[in-house]
Protein backbone atom coordinates (compact mmCIF):
# COMPACT_ATOMS: atom_id res chain seq x y z
CA UNK A 1 0.00 0.00 0.00
CA UNK A 2 1.32 3.34 -0.98
CA UNK A 3 1.88 6.03 1.71
CA UNK A 4 1.15 9.71 0.98
CA UNK A 5 2.45 12.54 3.21
CA UNK A 6 -1.02 14.05 3.69
CA UNK A 7 -2.18 10.82 5.39
CA UNK A 8 -0.05 11.68 8.44
CA UNK A 9 -1.65 15.11 8.51
CA UNK A 10 -5.13 13.59 8.28
CA UNK A 11 -4.39 11.25 11.19
CA UNK A 12 -3.11 14.18 13.26
CA UNK A 13 -6.06 16.35 12.19
CA UNK A 14 -8.64 13.71 13.08
CA UNK A 15 -7.04 13.15 16.48
CA UNK A 16 -6.94 16.88 17.13
CA UNK A 17 -10.58 17.32 16.13
CA UNK A 18 -11.60 14.42 18.34
CA UNK A 19 -9.70 15.77 21.35
CA UNK A 20 -10.99 19.32 20.84
CA UNK A 21 -14.54 18.03 20.43
CA UNK A 22 -14.29 16.07 23.66
CA UNK A 23 -12.93 19.11 25.51
CA UNK A 24 -15.65 21.31 24.01
CA UNK A 25 -18.39 18.87 25.01
CA UNK A 26 -16.98 18.53 28.51
CA UNK A 27 -17.33 22.29 28.89
CA UNK A 28 -20.98 22.11 27.79
CA UNK A 29 -22.10 19.30 30.06
CA UNK A 30 -23.00 21.61 32.88
CA UNK A 31 -22.77 25.26 33.71
CA UNK A 32 -21.81 26.43 37.16
CA UNK A 33 -24.71 27.47 39.35
CA UNK A 34 -25.38 31.16 39.78
CA UNK A 35 -24.21 32.69 43.03
CA UNK A 36 -26.10 35.10 45.26
CA UNK A 37 -23.85 37.95 44.11
CA UNK A 38 -24.54 37.14 40.45
CA UNK A 39 -28.29 37.31 41.08
CA UNK A 40 -27.92 40.27 43.46
CA UNK A 41 -24.83 42.23 42.31
CA UNK A 42 -25.68 44.96 44.83
CA UNK A 43 -23.70 42.93 47.38
CA UNK A 44 -20.53 43.46 45.33
CA UNK A 45 -20.97 47.22 45.72
CA UNK A 46 -19.68 49.28 48.63
CA UNK A 47 -22.30 49.99 51.32
CA UNK A 48 -23.59 53.57 51.50
CA UNK A 49 -25.51 55.64 54.07
CA UNK A 50 -28.71 54.82 52.16
CA UNK A 51 -28.18 51.13 52.97
CA UNK A 52 -28.77 51.71 56.69
CA UNK A 53 -32.42 51.05 57.60
CA UNK A 54 -33.98 54.39 58.45
CA UNK A 55 -36.59 53.56 61.09
CA UNK A 56 -36.05 52.03 64.49
CA UNK A 57 -38.23 49.00 63.70
CA UNK A 58 -36.04 47.92 60.80
CA UNK A 59 -32.79 48.80 62.62
CA UNK A 60 -33.88 46.63 65.54
CA UNK A 61 -34.85 43.86 63.15
CA UNK A 62 -31.44 43.93 61.43
CA UNK A 63 -29.74 43.91 64.86
CA UNK A 64 -31.90 40.98 66.03
CA UNK A 65 -30.87 39.09 62.91
CA UNK A 66 -27.21 39.90 63.75
CA UNK A 67 -26.58 41.37 60.32
CA UNK A 68 -23.53 43.62 60.02
CA UNK A 69 -24.33 46.95 58.34
CA UNK A 70 -21.92 46.07 55.52
CA UNK A 71 -24.27 43.25 54.52
CA UNK A 72 -27.46 45.35 54.26
CA UNK A 73 -28.43 46.98 50.96
CA UNK A 74 -31.31 49.35 50.22
CA UNK A 75 -33.04 47.92 47.13
CA UNK A 76 -36.03 50.19 46.61
CA UNK A 77 -38.93 52.25 47.86
CA UNK A 78 -42.65 52.46 47.16
CA UNK A 79 -45.35 54.58 48.84
CA UNK A 80 -43.41 55.31 52.03
CA UNK A 81 -42.00 51.81 52.37
CA UNK A 82 -38.28 51.02 52.09
CA UNK A 83 -36.98 47.63 51.03
CA UNK A 84 -33.62 46.11 52.00
CA UNK A 85 -31.77 42.94 51.05
CA UNK A 86 -29.32 41.37 53.45
CA UNK A 87 -26.82 38.55 53.40
CA UNK A 88 -26.43 36.44 56.49
CA UNK A 89 -24.10 33.56 57.16
CA UNK A 90 -25.42 30.07 56.77
CA UNK A 91 -25.60 27.85 59.84
CA UNK A 92 -24.13 25.00 57.79
CA UNK A 93 -21.14 26.59 56.06
CA UNK A 94 -19.06 29.75 56.25
CA UNK A 95 -18.93 29.81 52.44
CA UNK A 96 -22.71 29.84 52.02
CA UNK A 97 -25.07 32.76 52.52
CA UNK A 98 -28.71 33.12 53.37
CA UNK A 99 -30.63 35.88 51.62
CA UNK A 100 -33.07 38.01 53.61
CA UNK A 101 -35.60 40.63 52.58
CA UNK A 102 -36.60 43.44 54.96
CA UNK A 103 -39.67 45.62 54.55
CA UNK A 104 -39.74 48.87 56.55
CA UNK A 105 -43.24 50.33 56.26
CA UNK A 106 -42.88 53.86 57.65
CA UNK A 107 -46.57 54.71 57.30
CA UNK A 108 -47.57 51.75 59.48
CA UNK A 109 -44.48 51.96 61.74
CA UNK A 110 -43.78 48.30 61.24
CA UNK A 111 -40.95 46.25 59.76
CA UNK A 112 -40.63 42.60 58.90
CA UNK A 113 -38.27 40.21 57.21
CA UNK A 114 -38.20 36.98 55.30
CA UNK A 115 -35.06 34.86 55.32
CA UNK A 116 -34.27 31.48 53.91
CA UNK A 117 -33.22 28.92 56.48
CA UNK A 118 -30.99 27.15 53.97
CA UNK A 119 -27.99 28.42 52.01
CA UNK A 120 -28.83 30.47 48.90
CA UNK A 121 -30.29 28.25 46.19
CA UNK A 122 -30.15 29.69 42.65
CA UNK A 123 -33.13 27.54 41.65
CA UNK A 124 -35.21 29.43 44.26
CA UNK A 125 -33.84 33.00 44.12
CA UNK A 126 -36.97 34.95 45.14
CA UNK A 127 -37.78 36.11 48.68
CA UNK A 128 -41.26 37.23 49.71
CA UNK A 129 -42.23 39.26 52.75
CA UNK A 130 -45.38 40.78 54.14
CA UNK A 131 -45.80 43.20 57.01
CA UNK A 132 -48.94 44.64 58.41
CA UNK A 133 -50.67 46.38 61.23
CA UNK A 134 -54.20 47.51 61.89
CA UNK A 135 -53.42 50.49 59.62
CA UNK A 136 -52.58 48.39 56.56
CA UNK A 137 -50.25 45.85 55.00
CA UNK A 138 -47.44 45.65 52.45
CA UNK A 139 -46.55 42.54 50.47
CA UNK A 140 -43.46 42.55 48.27
CA UNK A 141 -40.93 40.31 46.57
CA UNK A 142 -37.15 40.48 46.28
CA UNK A 143 -36.11 39.31 42.81
CA UNK A 144 -32.75 38.84 41.06
CA UNK A 145 -31.29 41.50 38.78
CA UNK A 146 -32.39 41.37 35.14
CA UNK A 147 -35.49 39.28 35.83
CA UNK A 148 -38.05 39.66 33.05
CA UNK A 149 -41.61 39.61 34.39
CA UNK A 150 -45.00 39.58 32.73
CA UNK A 151 -47.06 42.70 33.36
CA UNK A 152 -50.26 42.53 35.34
CA UNK A 153 -52.60 44.95 37.06
CA UNK A 154 -52.02 45.17 40.79
CA UNK A 155 -48.31 44.29 40.58
CA UNK A 156 -45.73 47.10 40.52
CA UNK A 157 -42.01 46.82 39.86
CA UNK A 158 -40.60 49.39 42.30
CA UNK A 159 -36.95 48.76 41.36
CA UNK A 160 -34.68 46.27 39.66
CA UNK A 161 -34.96 44.02 42.73
CA UNK A 162 -38.42 44.76 44.17
CA UNK A 163 -41.96 43.94 43.05
CA UNK A 164 -44.84 45.19 45.19
CA UNK A 165 -48.34 43.78 45.24
CA UNK A 166 -50.38 47.00 45.09
CA UNK A 167 -53.84 45.44 44.87
CA UNK A 168 -54.71 42.53 47.19
CA UNK A 169 -57.35 41.37 44.70
CA UNK A 170 -54.84 41.16 41.81
CA UNK A 171 -54.19 37.87 40.06
CA UNK A 172 -52.65 35.39 42.48
CA UNK A 173 -49.29 35.02 40.77
CA UNK A 174 -46.87 36.70 38.43
CA UNK A 175 -44.38 34.72 36.36
CA UNK A 176 -41.10 35.60 34.76
CA UNK A 177 -37.69 34.35 33.84
CA UNK A 178 -34.05 35.11 34.52
CA UNK A 179 -31.42 35.65 31.79
CA UNK A 180 -30.37 31.97 32.06
CA UNK A 181 -34.04 30.98 31.43
CA UNK A 182 -34.73 29.93 35.03
CA UNK A 183 -38.45 30.49 35.55
CA UNK A 184 -39.65 32.36 38.63
CA UNK A 185 -43.12 32.72 40.11
CA UNK A 186 -44.24 35.41 42.54
CA UNK A 187 -47.27 34.17 44.45
CA UNK A 188 -49.58 36.40 46.46
CA UNK A 189 -50.08 35.49 50.12
CA UNK A 190 -53.77 35.04 50.79
CA UNK A 191 -55.55 35.32 54.09
Regions found by a protein language model. Give the residues of each.
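C-terminal motif of bacterial Sec signal peptides marking the signal peptidase cleavage site
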Residues: 24-27
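Mature extracytoplasmic domains of secretory-pathway proteins
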Residues: 73-150
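Extracellularly exposed regions in secreted/surface proteins, prominently low-complexity, repeat-rich
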Residues: 141-191
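Repetitive helical segments and hydrophobic/amphipathic motifs
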Residues: 17-20
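Extracytoplasmic low-complexity, Pro/Thr/Ser/Ala/Gly-rich segments
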Residues: 29-98, 181-191
Amino acid sequence: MRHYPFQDFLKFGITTVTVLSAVGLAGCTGSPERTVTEDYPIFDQQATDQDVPSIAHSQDLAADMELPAKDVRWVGQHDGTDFYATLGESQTSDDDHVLCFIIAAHEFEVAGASCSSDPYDPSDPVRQARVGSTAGAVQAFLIPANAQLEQADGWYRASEHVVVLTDPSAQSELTGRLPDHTEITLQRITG
